[in-house]
Amino acid sequence: MKVKICGITDMETAKRACEYGADALGFVFAESKRKITPGLAKEIIQELPANVLKIGVFVNESVEVIQKITENCGLTHVQLHGGEDNHQIRRLNIPSIKSLGVTSESDMKNAQGYETDYILFDSPKEKFHGGNGKTFSWELLAHMPKELREKAILAGGLNTLNIEEAIRTVRPYMVDVSSGVETEGKKDVEKIKQFIIKAKECSK
């Protein structure tokens, strides 16, 4: 099971997450309490192992801005949380992830229409896109077609207490956590370590 730690804002957390076995780190460039500047993201990314995915999170940003930040920071993928369509995805020409809030099984069917490398299934958006600590009914994704499952990333309120059930129900390619590894709104490296251990153990 691949694990993504999202909402990285400092070097120490990024390095520790990689040491503990994170496969991907997310850097939020959209409005969020976890927003990071491109300059700081670049500094962190330059110090990370080559095999770790560096994912930039954007919401309804212009193609030009996304391309510029991707190139300057050394991102490997972009995660799109707004109303982006396949026309914009093709124009970007960057490995991409489309995030979709899940409220019914039809959201899973809609996901198959996106021309992205991965689909991130999240809880429906609130004030900010993603990172709100809320789960959704994983049963809605239980009967996902194999070709979609192979590129599915599960997010939304995951933590060490529910990750086993989430993986067993959805069987995604990757799981994504942000608020579930925080204490008082800050990333907690011990929680990151335990989450990664649990996710990788329960998927063996």
Curated annotation (Swiss-Prot):
NCBIfam families: PRK01222.1-3
Keyword list, A-Z: Amino-acid biosynthesis, Aromatic amino acid biosynthesis, Isomerase, Tryptophan biosynthesis
Catalytic activity from the UniProt record: N-(5-phospho-beta-D-ribosyl)anthranilate = 1-(2-carboxyphenylamino)-1-deoxy-D-ribulose 5-phosphate
SUPFAM superfamilies named in the record: Ribulose-phoshate binding barrel
Protein name: N-(5'-phosphoribosyl)anthranilate isomerase
Name of a matching Pfam family: PRAI
Coiled-coil intervals, chain numbering: none
Native species: Bacillus cereus (strain ZK / E33L)
